[in-house]
Amino acid sequence: ADYRPSKTHGQFLAGCPDIVLNTRYIWVSNLSYERYRSWLKFLAEYERSVKSKSKGVFILEVNEAVGALRKERGIHNIVWKDMVGRYDITMFALLLLSEWKKPDIYKQYVAELASALSADNARLCGALSAARLELAENPQQCLEKQCEKLDFPPPPAETSAKAVWEVQLKVLFPITEQFRQQFTGRYGSQIERLLPLQAVYGEVFDEPGTVELGTLKYLCDLGKLAVAGEDLRGLVLFHKTRNTLAHLQTVDYTDVEELLR
C-alpha cells in the first residue's frame, strides 16, 4: 500500500513553531487557475492549523480570470482591476520619475505616456517609465521594445497612437492656452486698437483676451502687431501645436521638447 502521512503539508508546516516560514512573506506569481486552487487548499489547511502567534503571509498572484473567488478564513481576495486604476498607475510612474533632472511638466508628460500606453499594466508602466527619454522621443518604438522584453503582446499601432494623442491633448493643450492668454495680455493694447476682429470662420472677437492663436498669427504676418522675436517664435510653435492636435494628429518630439522646457 502507498504511504499516506497523517498530516497534510499545510497541517505539518502550521505545527512547526520555529521555522523561518513564520516570519516571511511568500509571493507566488503567475499562477494558473488550477495551481491557484491547489495553493488555496494548502493555505486553508495552514490557516486552520497554525498555532504560532507569528505566521507566514502568502500572496498568490493569479494570471487568469478566476470568476467569483472563494472566501476562506484568513484569506483576503484583491481583484487588481477593482483596486488599481489609471490614477494609481500614473502616480506610480511619477514616483519612478521623481528624481529625473527634468522640469515637472516634462516628467508629467512622460508619466502620462507610460500610464496610457501600458493600459494600466504596472510592470509595463514601470518598464516604460524606466526608458525615460526613449519613451518621450519615440513612444511607439519604445512600447514595442518593452513589450518584447516582457513577452507582452503589443497593442495595435492605431491604439497606441490614439493614446499618445490623448496624452498630448491633456498635457500640451493647457500650456497652449496659457501661452495665448499671456500673449494677449502682453500685447493687449495693440490688439485692442484693431478690434473688432473677424476670424476665418466668421467668429468675431470684441476683446483682446478672446482672440485665438490663428488670428494673432495672421495679424503678425501682416505686420499689424509688433512683438518680440521670442514671442513670435512661441506664437508660431503653439499655433502649429494647436492645429496638429485639432486634426487628431500627434506633435513631433522636437516640438514637444521645445514646448515642455
Task: Please annotate each region the language model reported.
Residues 9-24, 32-52, 62-240, 244-261:
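Amphipathic alpha-helical interface elements
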Residues 1-6, 22:
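Conserved P-loop NTPase mechanochemical-coupling segment
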